[in-house]
Swiss-Prot record:
Its EC number is 4.2.1.-. It is an enzyme of class 4 (lyase). This is Putative hydro-lyase Reut_A2449. One of its GO terms (molecular function) is lyase activity. It holds the Pfam family D-Glu_cyclase. Gene3D superfamilies: PSTPO5379-like, PSTPO5379-like domain. Belongs to the D-glutamate cyclase family. Keywords: Lyase. The keyword Glycosyltransferase does not apply.
């Protein structure tokens, strides 16, 4: 492929990402797996300034689950990851947390930034980013095939605490043909800024998952004969910390509903 053709492909991908954000700003709600292929996606959590240092330390101590791509200063809502984007409106669905409890989901978080003008926002790498390379390698991504949300599970693995924050690891799951698991691990492992290689392969009970067909977040997916469940660290882990730690106030993305950036996935390939 010539440089000119590569530039055209990148331009089309950026245009797709911007179109997606514009549609979410206009009120469209959908999981973002498979949206703007080739572009990086990010989880989001915004907390009052008083909790920002605790979370930054929590992310630093748990980089597999919480790889920070950008930190937006208190009260601001623009990011270097997407020119012209507004973090308050350009995610398809937000969750609102008060005292560690989920109180509502909203499509427009603007009033929450007005209510809490000191919110510090963290954008965290998402495994949706390496799904395009998986597909390009001929590895099926079941939730994209089925047009559903990725299944996510709370586990029995505790994250390293930091300050007032503690909680368990959350994982996403993709069923992978046994013959392709090594390939999936190698491909995803080249993207450490978006969770990297799997944290567990096989027996879900070893993670404390009693029923793999009943995810804590997202949708259940088919696991066919010859496939093995493969688990990756997940950016919903901060939401588990919000619940466990009783954080007074926080805004997050709804699981599976990410911030689609203008940054090519190749940026985070090592």
């Amino acid at each position: 492929m010539t440089n000119h053709m590569l530039d055209e492909v990148r331009s089309a991908a950026v245009a797709a990402a911007r179109t997606a954000r514009e549609s979410y700003r206009a009120g469209k709600i959908q999981p973002t797996a498979g949206v703007a292929p080739g572009m990086t996606q990010a989880n989001m959590i915004a907390l009052p300034r008083d909790w920002a240092w605790d979370f930054l330390l929590y992310a630093q101590r748990n980089p597999k689950a919480c790889p920070v791509l950008d930190v937006i200063e208190a009260g601001a809502y623009h990011t270097v990851l997407a020119e012209g984007a507004d973090i308050r409106t350009d995610i398809p669905l937000y969750r609102v947390w008060r005292n560690g409890r989920l109180v509502e989901e909203v499509a427009d978080a603007t009033p929450l930034w007005q209510e809490h003008p000191d919110l510090v926002t963290f954008l965290i790498g998402c495994s949706f980013t390496f799904e395009t390379p998986l597909l390009e390698a001929g590895i099926e991504v079941r939730h994209i095939t089925d047009g559903s949300n990725v299944p996510m599970y709370r586990t029995n693995r505790q994250c390293r605490p930091a300050g007032r924050l503690h909680g368990e690891l959350v994982v996403s799951m993709r069923p992978i043909a046994a013959s392709r698991i090594a390939d999936a691990a190698m491909i995803s492992g080249r993207f450490p800024s978006v969770h990297g290689a799997p944290v567990h392969v096989g027996n879900p009970e070893a993670l404390g998952i009693a029923d793999i067909h009943r995810p804590d977040f997202g949708d259940a997916v088919r696991i066919e004969s010859g496939e093995i469940p493969v688990f990756w660290a997940c950016g919903v882990t901060p939401q588990a910390a919000v619940m466990a730690s009783g954080v007074p106030f926080a805004v997050t993305h709804a699981p599976g509903h990410m911030f689609v950036t203008d940054v090519p996935d190749s940026t985070y390939h090592v």
